[in-house]
Each structure stands twice: as structure tokens, then as C-alpha cells.
Amino acid sequence: EERQVLRFEADRIESGGLPLPTRTDGEAEKITEKEETYFYSYDACDGRRSTGKAKAGCRISAGVKAGGYRELGVVFSVCGAGVREPMLHSTGFRAEDGNPDIHTRSRAGVRMSWREMTAWQIIEEQKACRKELEERAGFSSDMAVCLAKSASQFIAKRESTGGDTILAGFPFFEDWGRDTMIALPGVCLSTRRYDEARSILRTFARYEKDALMPNLFPEGGEEPMYNTVDAALLFINCVWLYYDATEDLAFVEEMYPVMERILEGYRKGTRFGIHMDQDGLIMAGEGLDQVTWMDVRVGEILPTPRHGKPVEVNAYWYNALCIMAAFSRKRGGDGAEYERLAEKVRGSFAEAFWMEEKHCLKDVISGTDADTQIRCNQIWAISMPFTMLDPERERQVVDTVFEKLYTPYGLRTLSQDDPQFRPSYGGEVLERDLAYHQGTVWAYPLGAYYLAYLKVNGRNGEERKRAEEYVRDQMQVLESALREGCIGQLPEIYDGENPVSSKGCFAQAWSVGEILRVYEHLEKVSE
């Protein structure tokens, strides 16, 4: 078999007469060719620094001092630019009736194995898959279209359960229960992948145990881990959002016994100190178990201890009670028991969590200094479908979050004026763990912030229009994030003080999903 021959000339790199688009850490001078920015520089996770250049049809040069030495890195790929068109062939697959899973259908419909297909056939098939994803999602803005296709990369089949799941992030994370329940509304529902949403929810419903949802499915068929207080409550929220999108009451009936067990278990008490207190609020956490999303543990050190009554958990609890009251009525009941408890929770929440002097909510009720720290967790008390605060207090929370925590790339996990604030995420594992939720910017809460902002600033027509324009303008900044790190994806985190370079996972499911929910609101719901 003839080997590929690369030809290097003064102003180009060729293979078989086809000019190759290149990326280099040298200086790129544009020449007359089609330009496509397909490639961006990256290096090891948690330390990406180089931005590089992405150019097609370039003359590449680099300066070297006398007697010096420099390696010039060049990454190139083939595209259709240049003197000849590549030979493209039909992929030979067709849509199978009754099978809406794009990836399954594509694989099942190919008439030859992957090994028998040419590179161009594989490329054309993937183009067709991505085109169908784009059309199904129905977004119009370029960023939303891109994210709708990127979202599909997180949906996977889990062999140990036999069902669909959502991988939390690349390259580090598997499918975490909490992450899945936060990501699912955007990754599946906003993109109209309802079959996958049902499959995922059925998988988790099957593994419900002691009123809890799995936090992690270990490899090798081992027993799932259940150390999460929020996944089960967010499961109920996902069923509600699924019903809101599909009006599939039959699926609600299927999930209803599971949801009943969850709320009953939280009322009576279950593992990890999770139980309802006398005031109706949920308490969680005991010993060294970290059961909220701020879950870092370093040996016997808990950098962000949140044992007690976490603010977002009680927002999820109230939301779940209201959802079950609504579902009960749709099934022919009156929902009175859930409504009475929800009303009790509503009164207790406002009294226990509101800080008049700071115009926002406490982060946790624990009797420690951590209670009054200003953190991003309070934003979910405004953005959930059912909330407890009056409109004026909701507006104050959104304003405080903007003033203390907002960046265009995400929300800080802790206010910069807090003595425990850590400005950067880096160094050894211990240093990173200690900074993980102590000021580090997380991308995914940004979706909840924008939804909350649209809620409190959208109570009449003109105000709503201005709010939507503001959010659209702010989200344009995120377009640069699609070109840094992993192309077309949104990352996990950024430094707290200067959030300009992504860190952690370069592609995070809940980051993508939550921004898709905002676009869904702007492009579909508001219309």
C-alpha cells in the first residue's frame, strides 16, 4: 500500500496535490486559499495555556535567535479547499421507522462495517447524523445549534444497566446521578430527544433505593453509590419537565410510585442523615459524607462543609412537593397532603434563610460561619419551576448574585470578599481540591442565573423584551468558549478571579445542557 507523502514548500504543505489546512505555534500569514478554523491549541487538562492559531492556506514562519533552537509544532488536516475535490460516496444508510435514536439508527442502518468504510463515508455519515440532530432540536442561533449537536456526545449506553445515560464530562467523569439530573433537561428535553430522556429516567428509577438515586454507577457491575441528597429530588423535577414538554401522562403514571417513595423517604429519614426536620425543611450530611454537589473531601478535611439544611436542597424539596401535588391532581387526586407540607416549607424557608442585611439567602443552616457565606447555590431557589420567595426578594437575590458572583463564563462558588475565597484553581491535587468550590467559577450555574434573571425581569412585555436582549448579548461572550479547550463544547470550570482559560473537564454535560435551556426559553418558550 502506498504511504502518504507530505510535501513541504515555502508557503504550503501538500499531500497528493491537496493543500492541508494547518495549525501552528508559529506566525501564520494568510495567503489566497479558503480558510476554515477547525483546530485550536490545547495541552494537558487543568493547565491549558496556549491558544495557537487555526488557519488554512497559510505561510508559516517562526523567529529564532542566533544560536538558538526552537521546535515548530504543526497540526494539519484535509478539507475540501484547494485544487481538487475529494471523492465522496454515499454512506448507504437509511432511517429505520420507529427508531428515533439517531446514533443507534445510523449504526444499525450502515450496510457495511466501520472497517469497510472509507474515511469520507464515515465523515458523510456523521454529517448526516449531526444535520438530523440540528433539525430535530430546532434552534436558530448558531451557538444553540452547535451546542445541540455537542449535547449528543454525552448520551451513551451503559452496559451494566442496559439503558441510556449521560456522561458527566470529558475526559474525567462517568455518569453521575446528580450531574445526569441537572444535564438531562437541556441535553435531552431542549433538543427534543424524548426517547433518550425516558430511557435515562427509567434506568435511575429502577435503581432507586431507600428513597435515593444512584450518585455513581461503578464499573464492573458493583453496587451503585448513593451518597447524594439532591439527585432524587432533581429526578422528580426531570419527570415534571419531561411531562411539560410531552404531556406524556402514561410515563408519569409509570414513575409515580418511585416519586412517592422518594418524598416519603425524605419525610421519614433515610441514609446520610437525610431527613425532614420539624419545620418541614430537609437536613442532610453526617460525619465525612458530602452529599451536595460541593462534595470535595480530602482525607478527613471537608473544604466546603454543608451539613445541615442546604439552600438549594430545600429549593428542590419544595419544588418536588409542588410537582407531586400537581401530578396527584392530574391522576384524579386532590394533592392536599403535598400542598399542606409545601406551604409549611415555604413559610419556614423564608424565615430561616433570608438575610435582610445582605439581600440574599443563606447558603446552609448549620449554626456555623458557613451559613452566611454568599454562594451561587441560592440561585436555584429562584430558577426552579416552583419557588418560595416573593417577587421583590427574588429580584434582590438575582441582583446580589450578579454583584458578587457573576461572570460571563459562569458563577463564582464564593464571593470574592469572603476570607476563604481562592482566586485560582491549579497546583497539586490538594491545592485544586481546596479551591474547587471556594471561588472557582463553574459554568453550569450560569444557566440557572439567566433563567432567574429572565423570570424577575420579565413580568411585563417591554421589560421581558429588554431582559431577553440583555441575556442574548451576555451569552455572545460564551461563543469564545466554544473555540477554546474543546471545540464546540463548554467546560467545567474557570479560575475565580480571572476566568479566561477553561479548566477541569474541557466538555461538561451540565454546562452545555443548562445553556441550551436558556436558548430554549429565548427561542421557543418566549415566542
Question: Which positions does each model-derived feature cover?
Answer:
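Acidic, mature catalytic/reactive cores of soluble proteins
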Residues: 1-527
